[in-house]
Amino acid sequence: MTQRMDKRFADLKEEGRPALVTYFMGGDPDFETSLAIMKALPQAGADVIELGMPFSDPMADGPAIQMAGQRALKAGQTLVKTLDMAREFRKGDQATPIVMMGYYNPIYVYGVEKFLDDALDAGIDGLIVVDLPPEMDDELCLPARKRDINFIRLATPTTDEKRLPMVLQNTSGFVYYVSMNGITGSALPDPSKVAGAVGRIKAHTDLPICVGFGVKTAEHARLIGASADGVVVGTAIVNQVALSLTKDDKATADTVQSVVTLVRGLASGVQTARLAAAQ
């Protein structure tokens, strides 16, 4: 639903701080643990949840997220189960926006119309499908928009002034600015360059700009959040899950709590981001 996403960003604008957008892989390391992580994220400080859809060939993802996807698939995670996870979450939380993130192939195999109907029923607010360019909007973007599901696009440092309006044309919810070229989990970008890029995109759209790739600590979140409307953290969370597991990739008593601790720290950075910008 577009209203839930719009309300969240409007409320945060009133508070004078950026959003903390947290990504985790659905089903990693197993369904129950992953669901427990998802349920714990809002209380830990997450404002928007990105729910990863595991896929066997995740070309844009770094090793950490690739391995998380493999763990999830090995544990039996499917697109049906990922939707079920969102549905279970919604029983206790009607306020936190959920964005499903992944690749087109599993959705295509599932059936686009059925997927969108089921996503709406499960309480999904938006989609990020990294391998569907604007030229393919008829495939999924426009049908999603007709159902009031946001379709969130990625912009990069190489998205030039000519390309940017096309990227933004049917985008809703927010714009995800990938602050560095390459795969997920790369080094932290230069905050001043990020601020310049955010300003450049804002000249073309009123949508919130969320910045990701490379944010791992509260200080990173504070620096990026000084100019962005949202700070996206994914690889750091996925790495924390991996570090908490046994040698055979099973959850431990510390798995959920270790993610909560990390996210609380990141949230503290986001909450002081505007103070940093004002100094």
Swiss-Prot record:
Catalytic residues in the record: 50 (proton acceptor), 61 (proton acceptor)
Q: Which Gene3D superfamilies match?
A: Aldolase class I
Asked if Transmembrane helix is a keyword of the record, the answer is no
| Enzyme Commission number(s) | 4.2.1.20
Q: Which positions make up the signal peptide?
A: none
The reaction(s) annotated as catalysed by this protein in its Swiss-Prot or TrEMBL entry are:
(1S,2R)-1-C-(indol-3-yl)glycerol 3-phosphate + L-serine = D-glyceraldehyde 3-phosphate + L-tryptophan + H2O
Asked if Mitochondrion is a keyword of the record, the answer is no
Family annotation (InterPro entries): Aldolase_TIM, RibuloseP-bd_barrel, Trp_synthase_alpha_AS, Trp_synthase_suA
Q: Which GO terms describe its molecular function?
A: tryptophan synthase activity
CC per GO annotation = cytosol
* UniProt-listed CDD domains: Tryptophan_synthase_alpha
Q: Which SUPFAM superfamilies match?
A: Ribulose-phoshate binding barrel
- Print the keywords alphabetically: Amino-acid biosynthesis, Aromatic amino acid biosynthesis, Lyase, Tryptophan biosynthesis
Pathway given for this chain reads:
Amino-acid biosynthesis; L-tryptophan biosynthesis; L-tryptophan from chorismate: step 5/5
Q: Which domain of life is it from?
A: Bacteria
Family statement drawn from the similarity comment of this UniProt entry: Belongs to the TrpA family.
Assembly: Tetramer of two alpha and two beta chains.
What function does the entry list? The alpha subunit is responsible for the aldol cleavage of indoleglycerol phosphate to indole and glyceraldehyde 3-phosphate.
**UniProt name for this protein:** Tryptophan synthase alpha chain
Q: Which organism is it from?
A: Allorhizobium ampelinum (strain ATCC BAA-846 / DSM 112012 / S4)
